[in-house]
UniProtKB/Swiss-Prot annotation:
It is found in: Secreted. Disulfide bonds: none annotated. Its EC number is 3.1.1.4. Heterotrimer: blocks the voltage-dependent L-type calcium channels from the heart, and the small conductance calcium-activated potassium channels in the chromaffin cells and in the brain. Is very toxic to mice. Expressed by the venom gland. GO terms for biological process: arachidonate secretion; lipid catabolic process; phospholipid metabolic process. It comes from Oxyuranus scutellatus scutellatus (Australian taipan). This is Phospholipase A2 taicatoxin. Contains 7 disulfide bonds.
Length: 27
């Protein structure tokens, strides 16, 4: 869905995210 797509974009672009954030976003 759109929310998941947004999370993928954030995962691709955000270098400051923690490992837990990546796991939550499904990346």
């Amino acid at each position: 869905n759109l929310a998941q797509f947004g999370f993928m974009i954030r995962c691709a672009n955000g270098g400051s995210r923690s490992a837990l954030d990546y796991a939550d976003y499904g990346c």
